[in-house]
């Protein structure tokens, strides 16, 4: 993706003219400019310089009276399903962008690209070429909060690799290497190890003191704590605060945190710029609910144990560019450092639980990408890579059996129905289209019902997407308090004959299920099976707990079905003999 196409050139433009323009704007390039009639090509050293050239020149710089148009050079064979969208308003919410993208087809992946510009850039993969073509036609130049979007193709690596399934691809061995190699059916996939960093937010005026003369101070911190420290100075130019990422063991992160906090306190005292310098920790929004705990109990305990005052930034501050919440800790240095240890312990636990759930989803739902679902924005360094990039799993192919349709009932607060439906039904339609699921809201059982049933019908991936968005919407619209985690009751139906297998002998299976998933699982006794001879299993918990419980129960049902079919097959063979 480092080769650029330069368009809208006068026919008299020479390579020397382009070399001069690139030199004037200090844009690095490699090789020579290949100039054609009205356009040219050039290679950049890496993706960083390619993006910088696009942001610097495209539609902004004139050459011989014409504005340059620069974008990634993409061969026609690779103009498939992937596009890049630039000039996105930085304050835009993920949901708004998702809704816009979903108007043109099924988004398989949406990941943010790190750039030095103030606006955001995302790479988007649609499910087929026609959807991508429509998106480019409609979105290029589309006005979004006074920003004109710029859209172009980017190379589709899968096309570059050539078709799979034993067929020879046109690119042969020159195709780009795969991110993950295919995994044999049933073979355990090796999970890529990703450590969660400690992310701090520090006042810009103290960054120089933290780095030190010629980097001496930060080198000393790195050496003493055995850590890797990144100071994100170039991001958000002019901002009052800068982010620092510390990569190390939990102990190493805590030691580095203490040293950085001590430097800031000393600098504040010497320069008399502040009476108090609080510790500010950045944590991805997905983990904050579990840090807070039910009715804020976890957070209160940390405050009491460490003698600190802790506040967390509002959900309203989250944007496309900023999926993290700011946790502010006030108190003595020692106490703040103890609080950091407790906070990051909770965050790491939440992260590990989510990784386990993601790993489970990657095996049960091939091709699932959590960035596309919108639960884990891919830009976050605190989020593991999508399972599909680790395992190399491919989406459902034509030779595979289509995923089985499932019906799930999710119970939401009655007052949240309007938010889920949206104005003139717009939100529920977009949600249904995004998840590729049927979503209906059942009438209230009584006029004063406090909950309403949402009926979702679709395959496993559709269930994951739809339920995830519903959980997210309820939190976003403040139907649950800022210190309260979203926990919903979900019903799935199982054959009455298999209910015993879900419960297990003496309740062993259901107890193991609850311990494993952290969800409450109830199979009500004395149920009368419905007309399809099915009974209800109730699941209560936060999103990942509920999803994991649903998948485990489906797994049990699949085993029961397989054993039943095997028994029937054996009986048939015995009769033939």
Swiss-Prot record:
In this chain, the stretch annotated as Disordered covers 160-190
Induction per UniProt is:
May be up-regulated in response to CTNNB1/beta-catenin activation.
Q: What's the name of the protein? A: Insulin-like growth factor 2 mRNA-binding protein 1
Biological role stated in the UniProt entry: RNA-binding factor that recruits target transcripts to cytoplasmic protein-RNA complexes (mRNPs). This transcript 'caging' into mRNPs allows mRNA transport and transient storage. It also modulates the rate and location at which target transcripts encounter the translational apparatus and shields them from endonuclease attacks or microRNA-mediated degradation. Preferentially binds to N6-methyladenosine (m6A)-containing mRNAs and increases their stability. Plays a direct role in the transport and translation of transcripts required for axonal regeneration in adult sensory neurons.
Chain spans, region Sufficient for nuclear export:
310-324, 485-495
**One GO term of the cellular component aspect?**
nucleus
Modification comment: Phosphorylated at Ser-181 by mTORC2 cotranslationally, promoting binding to the 3'-UTR of IGF2 mRNA.
Family that this chain belongs to: Belongs to the RRM IMP/VICKZ family.
**Compartments where found:** Nucleus; Cytoplasm; Cytoplasm, Perinuclear region; Cytoplasm, P-body
List the PROSITE patterns: KH_TYPE_1, RRM
Boundaries of every RRM domain copy: 2-75, 81-156
Q: Which gene encodes it?
A: IGF2BP1
**PANTHER family with a match to the protein in the record:** KH DOMAIN CONTAINING RNA BINDING PROTEIN
